[in-house]
């Protein structure tokens, strides 16, 4: 299979290949690019596994994936794109938000780890634009809007799910109280 055909190229997208903003996040520019993104995915899985259910992790990843696709399409200056880093940013940010927003009234280790991860993501996003493409292993530029979009998408998807879940739990509890009165 020619994986290069899955990379987002703006003109190919405009010519009707609507799937490219999504498939581009499954392919990479080089083997080191794959390794860095793969290592990030393994780290996130290992980091979140003891603390979170799969739902919030998948929602963070999905939110990042969709948000990256939207920003790649919306940005006329983005001529090409490949890589999972934006979607991984969504997974990281969404998972960290889920940890910070965990049920319970006290700030336990899970919440502090989630807050620390959110702060590290902000630091990374502040430092990364200061690096040039040659500073990176794969020699391709980092498309910062994808990282920002992925972060926002992960936060939005997990945040909306968390608020919806909390609201439905409160409604069920109110319903049960009303039923027993």
Language-model regions: role of each:
Residues 40, 59, 63, 67, ...:
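Hydrophobic faces of alpha-helical transmembrane segments in multi-pass integral membrane proteins
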Residues 20, 44-45, 101, 109-110, ...:
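Intrinsic low-complexity, intrinsically disordered segments enriched in polar/basic residues
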Residues 34, 59, 108-119, 145-148:
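Alpha-helical transmembrane segments of integral membrane proteins
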Residues 1-59, 66-82, 139-146:
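N-terminal TM1-TM2 helical hairpin plus the immediately adjacent luminal interfacial "cap"
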């Amino acid at each position: 299979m020619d994986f290069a055909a899955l990379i987002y190229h703006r003109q190919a997208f405009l010519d009707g290949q609507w799937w490219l903003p999504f498939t581009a996040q499954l392919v990479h520019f080089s083997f080191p690019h794959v390794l860095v993104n793969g290592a990030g995915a393994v780290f996130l899985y290992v980091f979140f596994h003891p603390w979170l259910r799969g739902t919030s992790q998948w929602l963070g990843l999905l939110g990042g994936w969709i948000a990256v696709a939207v920003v790649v399409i919306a940005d006329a200056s983005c001529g090409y794109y490949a890589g999972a880093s934006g979607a991984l940013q969504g997974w990281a940010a969404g998972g960290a938000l889920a940890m910070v927003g965990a049920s319970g009234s006290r700030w336990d280790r899970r919440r502090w780890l989630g807050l620390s991860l959110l702060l590290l993501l902000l630091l990374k996003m502040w430092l990364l634009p200061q690096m040039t493409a040659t500073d990176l292993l794969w020699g391709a530029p980092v498309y910062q809007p994808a990282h920002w979009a992925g972060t926002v998408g992960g936060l939005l998807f997990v945040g909306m799910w968390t608020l919806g879940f909390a609201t439905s739990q409160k409604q069920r509890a109110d319903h049960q109280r009303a039923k027993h009165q």
